[in-house]
């Protein structure tokens, strides 16, 4: 089930999945339904819902969710008459069994995510999704960490397993527009014409929209965004602002801009217990090239051990830590605290 309208950009909302990170995975069902209803009425193409770290991400390592994935998925599915219900799956966290449960709960699209050098672990999940008849896209996360040519090699693997779309995923919000252009163009040249390319950006260097536009102009046909930028770190490309920019550029999205503005201000911003914005901590994520969902974990560790969040993030970047290594955040904080005590 690939993108139905080949003449229109595919708008994938991630407010209820990436936005989970901003709320420590605590969306209640009433808010979930209200946001999904508003997005569906605004005519976005797809709405992603699951724990921030994907199916079965509710763990000690990543943070426990307010509900299980099936409850969230069913709540969104009940509100959608237009948008496709989408889930995220990271091999090693979620399983094929979890994907089948998500399908039973109402999901009809999945993004299978791996680190940018580990596409080979995605095969069974991609094949299972295709067997279920799901729209099957993939993420190559932390895409800033390898050159475009190496990223294209990984994308070809995902394509060979059955991926219908491969996303250039800037998990750290570290890429510049020219970096996005190079990666999308390289993938476009490497993949079959029918294999689509998507862009998933973060706003840590305030480039979420600029990078999305650069990716679209380079050949991407799917784009992720979230209401009020609700997502990990400084958030994703703000959906309402992105649609305004695309409207100005004459790019058809089919979305109701004012309805998205209203949903961002009336439904999403009031939920934020920590503002989703570019500040000294979230800016440090993009500058150091650190996985955006590390932010709140690093802030907790900084408070516990009396060190600067920026120092933790900088050291994580120096050590080239990636998603799944959240346990190392405390180790880094302890190392910094010990070094600080030694010179006191």
UniProtKB/Swiss-Prot annotation:
Annotated PROSITE patterns: PYR_CT
Residue positions binding Mn(2+): 18, 200, 202
Site (Transition state stabilizer): 17
Ligand binding (substrate): 17-18, 171, 200, 291
Keywords: Aromatic hydrocarbons catabolism, Lyase, Manganese, Metal-binding
Record flagged with keyword Plastid: no
Gene Ontology process terms (BP): catabolic process; L-leucine biosynthetic process
Catalytic reactions of this protein: (S)-4-hydroxy-2-oxopentanoate = acetaldehyde + pyruvate
Coiled-coil residue spans: none
InterPro entries, A to Z: 2-IPM_HCS-like, 4OH_2_O-val_aldolase, Aldolase_TIM, DmpG_comm, DRE_TIM_HOA, PYR_CT
UniProt family annotation: Belongs to the 4-hydroxy-2-oxovalerate aldolase family.
Protein name: 4-hydroxy-2-oxovalerate aldolase
């Amino acid at each position: 089930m690939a993108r139905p309208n080949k003449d229109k950009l595919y708008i994938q909302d991630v407010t209820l999945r990436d936005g989970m990170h901003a709320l420590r995975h605590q969306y209640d069902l009433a808010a979930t339904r209200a946001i999904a209803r508003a997005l569906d009425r605004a005519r976005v193409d797809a709405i992603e819902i699951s724990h921030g770290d994907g199916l079965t991400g509710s763990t000690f390592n990543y943070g426990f969710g307010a509900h299980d994935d099936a409850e969230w998925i069913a709540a969104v599915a009940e509100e959608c008459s237009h948008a496709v219900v989408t889930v995220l799956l990271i091999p090693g966290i979620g399983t094929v069994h979890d994907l089948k449960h998500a399908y039973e709960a109402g999901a009809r699209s999945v993004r299978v995510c791996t680190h940018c050098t580990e596409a080979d672990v995605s095969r069974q999940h991609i094949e299972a999704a295709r067997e279920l008849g799901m729209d099957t896209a993939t993420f190559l996360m932390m895409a800033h960490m390898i050159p475009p040519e190496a990223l294209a090699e990984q994308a070809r693997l995902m394509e060979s397993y059955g991926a219908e779309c491969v996303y250039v995923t800037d998990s750290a919000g570290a890429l510049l527009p020219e970096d996005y252009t190079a990666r999308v163009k390289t993938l476009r040249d490497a993949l079959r014409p029918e294999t689509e390319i998507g862009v998933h950006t973060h706003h840590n260097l305030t480039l979420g929209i600029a990078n999305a536009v650069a990716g679209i102009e380079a050949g991407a046909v799917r784009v992720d965004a979230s209401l009020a930028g609700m997502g990990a770190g400084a958030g994703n490309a703000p959906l309402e602002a992105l649609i305004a920019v695309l409207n100005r550029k004459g790019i058809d999205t089919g979305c109701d801009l004012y309805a998205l503005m209203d949903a961002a201000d009336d439904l999403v911003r009031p939920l934020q217990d920590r503002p989703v914005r570019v500040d000294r901590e979230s800016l440090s994520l993009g500058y150091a090239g650190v996985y955006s969902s590390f932010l709140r974990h690093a802030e907790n560790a900084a408070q516990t051990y009396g060190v600067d969040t920026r120092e933790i993030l900088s050291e994580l970047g120096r050590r080239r830590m990636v998603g799944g290594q959240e346990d190392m955040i405390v180790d880094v904080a302890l190392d910094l605290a010990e070094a600080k005590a030694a010179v006191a």
